[in-house]
């Protein structure tokens, strides 16, 4: 399960997608919309993605899987569109043979997605102002 979608994201769905008998650990991450940024109250976020975004997710997942023989499965999704406070914007799950590898692989996955995924975020603040983040 690797996607860029407008649909709500669920951690449990990603965990089920990677779970298997040979995996002793399933480690997950949910990046959720918070109500503030740098001391300003946030009311909502809107994400837009480049058409290549899903291909980039697949590339990152493949690299993480290839880099560690303990990785048994990877699921990762990023949401686009308007998100409310508390909504999941990024969900990742990694199944590995052992927990140490699971935590490390999930952290690398999230870090690489955050660094490489071509998405842009519009933050809307309580005072009516807005800003775009990660715009080239």
For each feature predicted by the language model, list its residue ranges.
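N-terminal, polar/charged subdomain of small-to-medium soluble alpha/beta proteins
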Residues: 1-90, 95-136
């Amino acid at each position: 399960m690797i996607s860029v979608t407008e649909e709500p994201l669920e951690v449990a769905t990603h965990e089920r997608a990677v779970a298997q008998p040979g995996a002793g650990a399933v480690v997950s991450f949910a990046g959720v919309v918070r109500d503030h940024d740098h001391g300003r109250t946030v009311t909502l976020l809107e994400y837009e993605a480049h058409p290549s975004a899903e291909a980039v997710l697949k590339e990152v997942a493949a690299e993480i899987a290839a880099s560690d023989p303990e990785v048994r499965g990877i699921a990762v999704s990023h949401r686009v569109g308007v998100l409310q406070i508390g909504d999941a914007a990024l969900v990742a799950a990694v199944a590995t043979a052992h927990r140490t590898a699971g935590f490390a692989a999930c952290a690398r996955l999230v870090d690489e997605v955050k660094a490489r995924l071509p998405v842009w975020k519009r933050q809307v603040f309580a005072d009516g102002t807005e800003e775009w983040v990660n715009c080239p």
